[in-house]
From Swiss-Prot:
It comes from the Eukaryota. Residues 9-64 form the SANT domain. Assigned as a member of the MYB-related gene family, I-box-binding-like subfamily. It is found in: Nucleus. InterPro entries: Homeodomain-like_sf (IPR009057), RADIALIS-like (IPR044636), SANT/Myb (IPR001005), SANT_dom (IPR017884). Residues 76-87 have a biased composition (Polar residues). Keywords: Nucleus, Transcription, Transcription regulation. Gene3D superfamilies: Homeodomain-like (1.10.10.60). This is Protein RADIALIS-like 1. One of its GO terms (cellular component) is nucleus. GO terms for molecular function: DNA-binding transcription factor activity. SUPFAM superfamilies: Homeodomain-like.
Amino acid sequence: MASSSMSSQSSGSWTAKQNKAFEQALATYDQDTPNRWQNVAKVVGGKTTEEVKRHYELLVQDINSIENGHVPFPNYRTSGGCTNGRLSQEEKRMRNMRLQ
């Protein structure tokens, strides 16, 4: 019974808390650390060694895609009132600024 609850806990998406623990564990356990993925999985909690390793591999793929220009930059400009004119005011200020 414990294994079924563990597998349901470990499958699926990652919580923000798990992602933060994952980042911290990667900083603690570098690639030369023996049993790196087991240690990372222990810190993250609720994930298997294989899931942690796969999560890392996907992260590396995402970084490579971004660095190779395969991911377009987002367009944050809006046309309309959702920013209540703040963006255009900020743009005006930036245009009037002079670098010293």
